């Protein structure tokens, strides 16, 4: 890739080139310049590179709009997966769960939990993981299909609109029921 970095390997199977402070711009199909903290470039050409941002509240609190625009452009390019982690995610890894000062939207409630349990039960194992733990999980897959379905489960959990459970279930595509 024309610069020094690291080679990361999991289970003697999943290999990545890991680069730090990577500029993403027009040459990468990104219309708004962005500098990622890390990018994992998979050796498996069927997978997309994973762009990682490490978000500290002190720096990012005043630029949420810019950060969101930059990341949305990267996502919409279709060439990358975007991932955000915090210092708490990394610092508390393998110790105890971070003590976040905000609501963890991965924790489903009432009707949302029922939908998640019924249609996304195999992904329930991910609900209590931090973003850093989830990043490590996605780095150990051959395709992103399971994580796409898991993401749909998370989206289902965000729904707050009053609707009957059966009406919502009817909206779920048959391909993932």
Name each region found by the language model.
Residues 1-177:
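Nucleic-acid endo/exonuclease domains
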């Amino acid at each position: 890739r024309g610069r020094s970095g690291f080679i990361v390997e999991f289970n003697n199977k999943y290999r990545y080139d890991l680069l730090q402070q990577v500029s993403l711009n027009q040459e990468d199909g990104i219309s708004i310049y962005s500098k990622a903290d890390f990018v994992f470039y998979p050796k498996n050409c069927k997978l997309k590179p994973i762009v990682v941002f490490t978000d500290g509240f002190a720096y990012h609190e005043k630029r949420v709009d810019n950060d969101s625009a930059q990341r949305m452009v990267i996502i919409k390019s279709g060439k990358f997966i975007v991932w955000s982690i915090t210092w708490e995610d990394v610092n508390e890894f393998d110790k105890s769960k971070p003590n976040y000062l905000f609501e963890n939207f991965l924790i489903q409630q009432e009707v949302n939990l029922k939908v998640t349990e019924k249609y996304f039960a195999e992904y329930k194992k991910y609900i209590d993981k931090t973003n850093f733990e989830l990043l490590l999980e996605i780095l150990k897959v051959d395709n992103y299909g399971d994580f796409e379905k898991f993401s749909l489960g998370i989206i289902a959990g965000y729904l707050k609109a009053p609707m009957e459970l059966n009406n919502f279930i009817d909206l779920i595509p048959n391909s993932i029921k």
